[in-house]
């Protein structure tokens, strides 16, 4: 083998080593701090590429922490908190770090989060000191929060605290921090922290409550996608096109009613899970998605009850009832599909789910276009045959 080939191979191995080493090094045990500070316990937190180093002094119930994470975007923020009463963000006693827009220096502030609308600097419910923030350039632009916290007596007795962490893309006006994303990773960024370090060096889970909330979000999405986004369009296609064929009467009507009633029942279940999620997520509002959901439930409920008032075919009001029924039906069809896409944008599942739903809608749309052409041919041919019939004297 020539010397030039050997050099190229050696350089290739060096290049691969340089690529691999940063990925391998991103663990809590490999991190170092200024002043050679060390902490006996560290955790690779399961969400948001975050790490926690800590020590607990039982003699004075003091918890010393270093929280490290990359902001969601350059110029964003990171936060670590203890929630004395619950597991979510509301009620959290929070430390927030970001780079001051004026001078670019990392700073740390405290937030007592009573609601999602009160994200402004405020005093915590317990003492905290030695607060400092710094940028860790070697860790891909991560920020670090240093602090010592006086752990409340009731939490000391439990031996554990509920910790919450978060990252956001930007700062808001008036000293407020900007809104963070509501992806699964953001919603699952909470866990129980053992003060004695029994979970030291491990990766910890977000807890059953978080997993249940994510499961409910997925159930809500599936129920509503199937009902408003698939079954209702199928029912509309059945009503519009099958009725043209005399041989399909009255089967098309019962198929239409069965499909729409099933969609309504499933949709109500999805709507109820949405209400439950809203009640469990105080301060989190997706107004457009919520309002469309309420409108869908209202229109669909009216549509169901209107079936009880359906006039007979020869009744003088049947024409007006048909206009109402078709108008409300198409409104439900349109709003349902729009809201499914809004829900997908909120849930942010894997691209395959959104692609699959787009494929389903495309197939239904293609079937509708094909049936539209076929039924027009049938109707025009029927009219032509009727016009050619001789008049009886």
UniProtKB/Swiss-Prot annotation:
It is a multi-pass membrane protein. Its cofactor is heme b. Residues 48-168 form the DOMON domain. Binds 2 heme b groups non-covalently. Residues 1-25 form the signal peptide. The chain crosses the membrane at residues 219-239, 251-271, 291-311, 327-347, 360-380. Heme b 2 binds at residues 256, 325. GO terms for cellular component: plasma membrane; plasmodesma. CDD domains: Cyt_b561_FRRS1_like, DOMON_CIL1_like. InterPro entries: AIR12_DOMON, Cyt_b561/ferric_Rdtase_TM, DOMON_domain, UCP037471. It is found in: Membrane. One of its GO terms (molecular function) is metal ion binding. Keywords: Electron transport, Heme, Iron, Membrane, Metal-binding, Signal, Transmembrane, Transmembrane helix, Transport. Residues 184-380 form the Cytochrome b561 domain. Its main location: membrane. Pfam families: Cytochrom_B561, DUF568. The keyword Cytoplasm does not apply. Heme b 1 binds at residues 220, 289. May act as a catecholamine-responsive trans-membrane electron transporter. DOMON domain could bind catecholamines and thereby could regulate the cytochrome b561 domain function. DOMON domain could bind one heme b. This is Cytochrome b561 and DOMON domain-containing protein At3g25290.
């Amino acid at each position: 083998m020539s010397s030039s080939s050997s050099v190229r191979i050696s350089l290739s191995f060096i290049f691969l080593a340089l690529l691999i080493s940063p990925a391998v090094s991103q663990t809590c045990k490999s991190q170092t701090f200024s002043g050679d500070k060390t902490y006996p316990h560290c955790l690779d937190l399961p969400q948001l590429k975050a790490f926690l180093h800590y020590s607990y002094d039982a003699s004075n119930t003091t918890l010393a922490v270093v929280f490290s994470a990359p902001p969601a975007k350059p110029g964003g923020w990171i936060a670590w908190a203890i929630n004395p009463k619950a597991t979510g963000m509301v009620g959290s006693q929070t430390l927030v770090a970001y780079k001051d827009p004026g001078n670019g220096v990392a700073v740390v502030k405290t937030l007592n989060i009573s609601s999602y609308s009160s994200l402004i600097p405020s005093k915590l419910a317990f003492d905290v000191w030695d607060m400092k923030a710094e940028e860790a350039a070697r860790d891909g632009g991560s920020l670090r929060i240093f602090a010592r916290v006086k752990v409340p007596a009731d939490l000391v007795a439990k031996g554990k605290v509920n910790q919450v962490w978060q990252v956001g893309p930007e700062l808001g006006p008036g000293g407020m921090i900007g809104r963070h994303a509501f992806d699964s990773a953001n919603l699952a960024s909470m866990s129980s922290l053992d003060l004695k370090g029994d979970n030291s060096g491990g990766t910890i889970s977000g807890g059953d409550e978080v997993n249940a909330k994510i499961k409910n979000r997925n159930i809500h999405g599936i129920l509503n996608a199937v009902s408003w986004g698939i079954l209702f369009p199928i029912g509309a296609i059945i009503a519009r096109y099958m009725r043209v064929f005399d041989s399909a009467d009255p089967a098309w009507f019962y198929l239409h009613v069965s499909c729409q009633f099933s969609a309504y029942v499933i949709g109500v279940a999805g709507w109820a899970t949405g209400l439950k999620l809203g009640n469990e997520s105080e301060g989190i509002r997706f107004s457009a998605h919520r309002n469309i959901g309420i409108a869908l439930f209202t229109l669909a409920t009216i549509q169901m009850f209107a079936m009880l008032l359906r006039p007979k075919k020869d009744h003088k009001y049947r024409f007006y009832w048909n206009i109402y029924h078709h108008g409300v039906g198409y409104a439900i069809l349109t709003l349902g599909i729009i809201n499914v896409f809004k829900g997908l944008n909120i849930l942010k599942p894997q691209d395959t789910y959104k692609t699959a739903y787009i494929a389903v809608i495309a197939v239904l749309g293609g079937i509708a276009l094909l049936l539209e052409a076929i039924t027009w041919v049938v109707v025009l041919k029927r009219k032509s045959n009727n016009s050619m019939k001789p008049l009886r004297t």
